[in-house]
């Protein structure tokens, strides 16, 4: 079976989609966003296709497309959509699969189920994206604790933003996990610049093995 990698984050708006695009491009993978909330601006799937350089057929259609830009549980209620979390199964594809969640681990899909509940059922290796700015130590260590409490395999932490060596070091030490690399902020964000930045900061094979 090809590698299946879940990309999640400590919070929303930290650059998780940009990282997912870089990872999918580096692995020549297929990308899937199960639930998209908000359709007026560019969707995450659209951004990943634009930034990854992948062909359109490598971007799988979302299982749910919700018009309202809100947490999926609320967006679904406003839009009159019932999200069947039991039907959210990882697609079977012939190459690596990068799956992106929404916001953080505890974002609700319904009034009863959060993303981390689905991740635990999938039991696929997970990459935790974390910002490097003030407050990241607490948010990231809490996220790692939640992941470990559910026996989800954690590949490591991908840091996003400006260099903050002490915060990055204390997170991997106290979290007993790997620092996969750090994707810096890019003045010019396009497919070529993102590909170069990812290649300089990450080793693709770190994402293809079993979680340590």
Swiss-Prot record:
Give the similarity note: Belongs to the dethiobiotin synthetase family.
Question: Which positions are annotated as binding Mg(2+)?
Answer: 17, 100
- Upper classification of the organism: Bacteria, Pseudomonadati, Pseudomonadota, Alphaproteobacteria, Hyphomicrobiales
Q: Which GO terms describe its biological process?
A: biotin biosynthetic process
Query: Which catalytic residues are annotated?
Result: 33
- Tell me its EC number(s), please: 6.3.3.3
Asked if the keyword Metal-binding belongs to this entry, the reply reads yes
Tell me which GO cellular component terms the UniProt record holds.
cytosol
Protein name per its UniProtKB record: ATP-dependent dethiobiotin synthetase BioD
An example Gene Ontology molecular-function term: dethiobiotin synthase activity
**Annotated function:** Catalyzes a mechanistically unusual reaction, the ATP-dependent insertion of CO2 between the N7 and N8 nitrogen atoms of 7,8-diaminopelargonic acid (DAPA, also called 7,8-diammoniononanoate) to form a ureido ring.
Keywords recorded for this protein, A-Z: ATP-binding, Biotin biosynthesis, Cytoplasm, Ligase, Magnesium, Metal-binding, Nucleotide-binding
State the oligomer form and interacting partners. Homodimer.
Cofactor(s) recorded for this entry are: Mg(2+)
Residues annotated as binding substrate are: 37
Catalytic reactions of this protein: (7R,8S)-7,8-diammoniononanoate + CO2 + ATP = (4R,5S)-dethiobiotin + ADP + phosphate + 3 H(+)
Q: Which InterPro entries match?
A: DTB_synth_BioD, P-loop_NTPase
Pathway(s) it belongs to: Cofactor biosynthesis; biotin biosynthesis; biotin from 7,8-diaminononanoate: step 1/2
